């Protein structure tokens, strides 16, 4: 099993319609830039929250216009540079399948599948007590069989209460009340945990596994390590240290996942000053955990030079 010292987490959630998608991407240059920035591990997107796959898949939906195996090329070139790669799958969000299969979405108490802030990401969430569960298990299984990945990273494991028939029937089977809000919430939580154990069963023993969204205690015995996601520009600088202190009691390794953004995910124009990113790195080191920088890959060009010069400065 690989160990992580300095990592990068690549977010990549890309709407259709980008006509020059991947035109300037070169996987060898990508891996060499990571190596030059002293990176030894990355979380690399196999399926994003829009619902697109970035590899040839018999299960999912490839990004429209993607003409090459983006994930596979990155994996090969990173391995040549000694960099480990986990395959990233967004679980809670899949807007393409939600569009095609409304019956795979969480149904709220008012009978809606679209609710909340329509301008944000979580205006509809996928239900793992639907056909979506097997869909995702099949796609994850496809990747771990097809590629020599070093791990799997599951994201957006959201325990959104679902009042659909499948969840109601499951609650009744467990002698609960499908109209009782705490029972519905507990069903959603247990469904996530059970699904993650199913994914764990697809993986070799030496593979890293992070179910991001489960609590630290829920990950014990399941996860290879815990990643403490904290973008302090928005979340606050007191969030990480409290979680790190608790993580030290779990007897599994931990990683501090900050971001290169001034604010939070999606702050595409934001690049932290060296002192700010350096503070996060020292925060990780002083708490005895590994260090990871969250980034978002440019859909045409790949890694941005300024970002990785900054990461290189801090990791040096």
Kindly label every feature range from the protein language model.
Residues 2-7, 37-42, 79-86, 147-151, ...:
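Loop/turn elements at helix/coil->beta-strand transitions in domains of secreted/extracellular proteins
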Residues 9-25, 53-69, 117-139, 177-192, ...:
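The substrate-binding groove and active-site-proximal loops of carbohydrate-active enzymes
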Residues 11-13, 43-51, 89-96, 153-164, ...:
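Short, solvent-exposed turn/loop segments enriched in Gly/Ser/Thr/Pro and often Arg
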Residues 25-50, 146-147, 280-283, 287:
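Catalytic domains of carbohydrate-active enzymes, especially glycoside hydrolases
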Residues 45, 150-155, 169-197, 202-316:
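Hydrophobic targeting/anchoring helices
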Residues 48-93:
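Aromatic-lined substrate-binding rim segments of carbohydrate-active enzymes
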Residues 54-66, 91-119, 155-180, 227:
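Aromatic- and acidic-residue-enriched segments that line the glycan-binding/catalytic groove
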Residues 71, 87, 91-147, 197:
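Active-site-adjacent "subsite" loops/lids of carbohydrate-active enzymes
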């Amino acid at each position: 099993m690989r160990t992580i010292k300095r990592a990068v987490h690549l977010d990549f959630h890309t709407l259709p319609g980008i006509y020059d998608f991947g035109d300037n991407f070169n996987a060898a240059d990508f891996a060499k830039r990571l190596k030059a920035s002293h990176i030894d591990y990355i979380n690399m997107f196999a399926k994003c929250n829009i619902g697109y796959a970035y590899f040839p898949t018999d299960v999912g939906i490839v990004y429209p216009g993607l003409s090459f195996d983006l994930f596979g090329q990155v994996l090969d070139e990173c391995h040549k540079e000694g960099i480990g790669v986990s395959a990233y799958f967004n679980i809670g969000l899949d807007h393409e399948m939600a569009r095609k299969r409304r019956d795979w979405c969480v149904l709220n108490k008012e009978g809606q599948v679209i609710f909340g802030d329509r301008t944000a990401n979580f205006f509809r969430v996928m239900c793992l007590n639907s056909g979506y569960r097997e869909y995702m298990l099949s796609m994850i299984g496809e990747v771990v069989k097809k590629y020599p990945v070093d791990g799997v990273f599951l994201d957006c494991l959201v325990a959104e209460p679902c009042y659909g028939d499948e969840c109601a029937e499951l609650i009744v089977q467990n002698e609960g009340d499908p109209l009782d809000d705490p029972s519905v919430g507990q069903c959603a939580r247990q469904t996530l945990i059970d699904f993650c154990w199913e994914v764990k069963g697809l993986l070799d023993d030496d593979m890293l596994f992070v179910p991001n969204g489960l609590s630290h205690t829920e990950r014990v015995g399941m996860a290879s390590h815990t990643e403490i996601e904290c973008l302090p520009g928005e979340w606050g600088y007191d969030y990480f240290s409290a979680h790190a202190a608790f993580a030290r009691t779990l007897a599994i390794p931990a990683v501090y996942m900050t971001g290169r953004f001034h604010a939070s995910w999606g702050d595409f124009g934001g690049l932290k000053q060296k002192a700010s990113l350096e503070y996060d790195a020292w925060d990780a080191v002083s708490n005895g955990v590994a260090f990871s920088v969250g980034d978002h890959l440019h859909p045409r060009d790949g890694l941005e030079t300024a970002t990785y010069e900054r990461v290189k400065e801090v990791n040096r």
